[in-house]
Each structure stands twice: as structure tokens, then as C-alpha cells.
């Protein structure tokens, strides 16, 4: 009020002087509170004396609300800043809601929100979850300064987009086959020639939602990818030379799981619809038939396709997917997909072409 009204500027100067003394741990030697209250209540006392007491109470309530709002706003700014530094998003519970970070598909936090808990009259839980979340963020600050080595986070039976070269550094990306930003990252990787400079591998991570998965067929595609990684092949191109090597079909020397990803991320239907959008809109049976057709197109025979389909539904693949979930959430600690680790850094969200060069 002091900024726009001359009659309140005296109070503004007194208030700032008092604030400075408080910050420097000195007593506030002014009757500012009472002076301001008297100034505001004087017109009411003249016109309607009986309203002075309730108006005084109202001023106290408003004053406390202003204080609480200021404190909460300051806390929110600090928390958002820490989240932006650590996770690349000002809201780690819903990374997509923050426009300051890189574009990404959010990994939702299943913990009840502060106001959600308040609405359920769980005050203790609201503050407990809030400060636990802040504590977790603070504990992750060192990860922004650490040297990230992609080889320390490799999944089981990893495959590589190009032929593995021990002379090249390794890069690891966390992807959800249904996430549109993973598709954009793949396009940027190809445009930058990233796979020619790094041994690029991936962790398939289907993002869970409140009811099932964020993208309906992400789990199905992930099951097929892991089954393909488990399937033996005579050709070791695109692998690190593990005992169990993934299927490699055709003349490209590219593992079939990568061929599936490339089809999803870069291919289109005859009508020009991206295959990723197509798969996201299909029911399970139709998506399964589409994947089986691709495997046949990539050179697998009927028996091999049947084997892949069986392995995809196995407990072994389920265990691998569970291990990948733990890897992403508890070791990599990202809240955004895609996430890519290379050159000693963890990059959360979509990385542009220049950032990949």
C-alpha cells in the first residue's frame, strides 16, 4: 500500500526498518503494529464504534494469513528451485506441469499431495509427506555434481544401436515406448549422429499411472523388447558380446529390439500416422498382432515369433522389468522420461540436437 499511496508511505518505512532489525536479531523498537491498527480502525470508531472490536479481530486474522502466505510462498520458491536444480523440473510430483524444465513425460509420484492430504483431514500426513519430499530432494543435490558413468547403470542383456566399440564411451537412455518425447529424442539422436560417437543402449521403463500405465501398450512393447534381448542369435552385432545375445535379423546388423524401437519412433502408417500414436491407440490384441507382423517383416520365422511371444509373457521378463523399475527409480533417481546419461552427466528430459553433439 505504501508503494501506491502517499499516506501509507510512513508506515512502509517503519515496517521496513522493523523488518531489518528483526533480520539482524535486534528488537523492533516501534509501536508500528498498534499505530497501523489505530490508523485503520479510526474511521470505523467514528462511524460505527460497535464494529471496532470485530474489525480488530479481523485485522489480526488477515495479518496472520499474510504472514503464513508469505512464509509458504517463500518455502515453495525454495523447494521449486531445489527441484529444478536436482530433477530439472520445479514440480517433481508432476514434472510435466513445470514449463521451466526440458520437455518430458513425467513419472508421477504416487504419494498424496499436501492439499490432497489436507482435504482428507490428514494434517500430520500432509506435513510429513511434504518435508519427506523436501528431504529427499536435498539428499539428491550431490547427484548433480557427481560424475555419471552410464556403465554403472546398465540393465540386464543390454543391446546397442550400433556395433559395440570398446573405444567409444557408453550412453544410456531411459525410455517409455509410448512417450512422444522419447520419439523426439530418438530423432535428435539420429540427426546428431550420436550413435556413431557412443555405444548407445537403453532401459525400457513403462510409466505407471493411476489406473494401469500412462500409455496403454507401453508394458506390452517393453515385454517384447526384453524378450528379444533374451533370444539367442548367431550374429553378435550391436551387442557387447554377452553369452546370451539378442536376435539380429536382416542385413542391417541392428538388434531386432532396436529395429522395433526405430519403427515405433520413426515409422508411419500408410496414412501418415506415426506408429507410436497408432500403437498407443490400439487394444492389446491389435497391438500384439502389429508387433508380431513387424517381427516377421524383420526376418523372424513363425516359430521364432511364437517363442518371443511366449518369453514376453514369462516370469523372467516380468522380473527384468521389475529390476529396471528399481534401477530407474532408486539408482538413477529420475522423475522424467526420457533421461539420458552421457559425458558424465544425467540429462533429464528432451535433449536437442546441439546438446547431443
Give residue ranges: language-model regions.
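Cytosolic juxtamembrane regulatory segments of multi-pass membrane proteins
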Residues: 24-40, 98-108
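Membrane-interface motif at the C-terminal end of an N-terminal transmembrane signal
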Residues: 4-5, 68-86
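Structural alpha/beta surface segment adjacent to cysteine/selenocysteine redox centers
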Residues: 183-296
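Extracytoplasmic thiol/disulfide redox context detector
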Residues: 80-219, 240, 318-333
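Loop-to-transmembrane boundary segments
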Residues: 35-69
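Hydrophobic alpha-helical segments
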Residues: 1-28
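Active-site-proximal beta-strand/loop segments in catalytic clefts of secreted hydrolases
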Residues: 174-175, 203-206, 263-265, 343-345, ...
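C-terminal cap of thioredoxin/glutaredoxin-like
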Residues: 285, 289-357
Amino acid at each position: 500500500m505504501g508503494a501506491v499511496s502517499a499516506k501509507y508511505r510512513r508506515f512502509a518505512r517503519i515496517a521496513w526498518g522493523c523488518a531489518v532489525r528483526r533480520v539482524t536479531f535486534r528488537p523492533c523498537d516501534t509501536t508500528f503494529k498498534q499505530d497501523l491498527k489505530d490508523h485503520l480502525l479510526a474511521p470505523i470508531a467514528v462511524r460505527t464504534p460497535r464494529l471496532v472490536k470485530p474489525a480488530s479481530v479481523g485485522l489480526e486474522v488477515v495479518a496472520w494469513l499474510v504472514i503464513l502466505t508469505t512464509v509458504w510462498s517463500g518455502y515453495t520458491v525454495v523447494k521449486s528451485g531445489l527441484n529444478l536444480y536436482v530433477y530439472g523440473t520445479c514440480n517433481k510430483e508432476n514434472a510435466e506441469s513445470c514449463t521451466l524444465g526440458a520437455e518430458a513425460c513425467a513419472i508421477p509420484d504416487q504419494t498424496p499431495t499436501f492439499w490432497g492430504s489436507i482435504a482428507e483431514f490428514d494434517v500430520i500426513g500432509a506435513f510429513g509427506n511434504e518435508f519427506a519430499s523436501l528431504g529427499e530432494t536435498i539428499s539428491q543435490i550431490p547427484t548433480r555434481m557427481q560424475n555419471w558413468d552410464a556403465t554403472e547403470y546398465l540393465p540386464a542383456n543390454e543391446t546397442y544401436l550400433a556395433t559395440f566399440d570398446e573405444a567409444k564411451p557408453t550412453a544410456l537412455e531411459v525410455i517409455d515406448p509410448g512417450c512422444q518425447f522419447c520419439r523426439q529424442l530418438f530423432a535428435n539422436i539420429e540427426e546428431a549422429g550420436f550413435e556413431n560417437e557412443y555405444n548407445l543402449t537403453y532401459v525400457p521403463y513403462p510409466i505407471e499411472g493411476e489406473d494401469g500405465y500412462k500409455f496403454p501398450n507401453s508394458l506390452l512393447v517393453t515385454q517384447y523388447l526384453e524378450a528379444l534381448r533374451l533370444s539367442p542369435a548367431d550374429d553378435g552385432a550391436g551387442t557387447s558380446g554377452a553369452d546370451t545375445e539378442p536376435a539380429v535379423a536382416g542385413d542391417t546388423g541392428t538388434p531386432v529390439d532396436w529395429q522395433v524401437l526405430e519403427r515405433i519412433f520413426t515409422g508411419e502408417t500408410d496414412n501418415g500416422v506415426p506408429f507410436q500414436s497408432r500403437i498407443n491407440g490400439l487394444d492389446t490384441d491389435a497391438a500384439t498382432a502389429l508387433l508380431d507382423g513387424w517381427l516377421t517383416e524383420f526376418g523372424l520365422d513363425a516359430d521364432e515369433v511364437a517363442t518371443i511371444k511366449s518369453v514376453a509373457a514369462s516370469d523372467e521378463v516380468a522380473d527384468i522389468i521389475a529390476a529396471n523399475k528399481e534401477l530407474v527409480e532408486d539408482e538413477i533417481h529420475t522423475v522424467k522420461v526420457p533421461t539420458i546419461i552421457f559425458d558424465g552427466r544425467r540429462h533429464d528430459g528432451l535433449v536437442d540436437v546441439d546438446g547431443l553433439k
